[in-house]
Amino acid sequence: MDQSSSGGSMGGRLPFNQSFWEEFLMGREGHLPALPEISHVSKSVVRILGGNPGSMHLQGTNTYLVGTGRSRILIDTAQGLPVWISRISSFLYTQKIELSYVLLTHWHGDHTGGVPDLISQNSSLSNRIYKNRPDSGQNPITHGQIFSVAGATVRAILTPGHSVDHMCFLLEEENALFTGDNVLGHGFSVAQDLGRYMDSLRDMASLGCRIGYPAHGAVIEKLPGKLEEYIQHREGRERMMLSALTRQRVQGEGVREGGVKCGLTLNEIVMVIYGRLPQEVIEKALAPSLLQVLWKLTEDRMVGFKPGDPLKRQWFALEQKKRNKVRGCPS
């Protein structure tokens, strides 16, 4: 949907506040299963941890060597810490492995940070780096593009949402999917664009892959179930918010000044769904994700809003007959 027609812009979508979540996520980190620094997760996939465990990275960024011969594919390069380049360089040397392709799932620094170290170790890799929407000197990846080495045929799958450039990679020999940050081994991921993210989750599910190799966390042994869990989780939140706004409209409690019929502010929606919470929790923790849901419902023509500050504007459920009209506060 054109942003100008919504009465707002992407600037109205509050950013995820990482620092606010640090204490909570650190507690979650303590309950994660330990993962080996280097492990053969299948006969053709070796996982090498990035050495960057933490609140936002779980046990660290997973990087993967794919293939069975001397020539391999590397998926992601972690954050750029010395421990990772030491681990992978040692493994490549002792196993007499060469890299034919370096595939990046997306632009975030905990996936691309190791690229300079790889190139400094082996300058010939400078023309073997592939990414959707590539940086200068990198090669583009297109949807459906095939990368092949002995024992591995890897197909690129465009899956935006977590980031605009996000790609997954399907390992055809195993019917397995490298899920990047779209689906994690533990917990749930975050999305930059919820609508596109939901479409990508459904696209991933339609592939029918049985195993997931996530960019963070343990191997996903039952990927179809995990994808369904992710989809149901997001759809459930949409239903809760739409239900709250629909009740407000049906009960006629949203009549404001001059008889103009509007809905609920974000704070009021939170009160209906979660009860009374500290304002700091609403603004820093809940607001970014809940506003994403409201924007998606707006783009789906289920919800409208009165323009204004994202935390103070009023959101309302659209009546069925108005869902095909331009959104704005109904009169």
Swiss-Prot record:
SMART domains: Lactamase_B (SM00849). SUPFAM superfamilies: Metallo-hydrolase/oxidoreductase (SSF56281). Pathway: Secondary metabolite biosynthesis. Zn(2+) 1 binds at residues 106, 108. One of its GO terms (biological process) is antibiotic catabolic process. It is an enzyme of class 3 (hydrolase). Binds 2 Zn(2+) ions per subunit. The active site is at residue 110. GO terms for molecular function: beta-lactamase activity; zinc ion binding. Transmembrane segments: none annotated. Pfam families: Lactamase_B. Keywords: Hydrolase, Metal-binding, Zinc. PROSITE patterns: BETA_LACTAMASE_B_1 (PS00743). Its EC number is 3.1.-.-. Zn(2+) 2 binds at residues 110-111. Its cofactor is Zn(2+). The keyword DNA repair does not apply. Lactamase-like protein; part of the gene cluster that mediates the biosynthesis of neosartoricin B, a prenylated anthracenone that probably exhibits T-cell antiproliferative activity, suggestive of a physiological role as an immunosuppressive agent. The non-reducing polyketide synthase nscA probably synthesizes and cyclizes the decaketide backbone. The hydrolase nscB then mediates the product release through hydrolysis followed by spontaneous decarboxylation. The prenyltransferase nscD catalyzes the addition of the dimethylallyl group to the aromatic C5. Belongs to the metallo-beta-lactamase superfamily. This is Lactamase-like protein nscB.
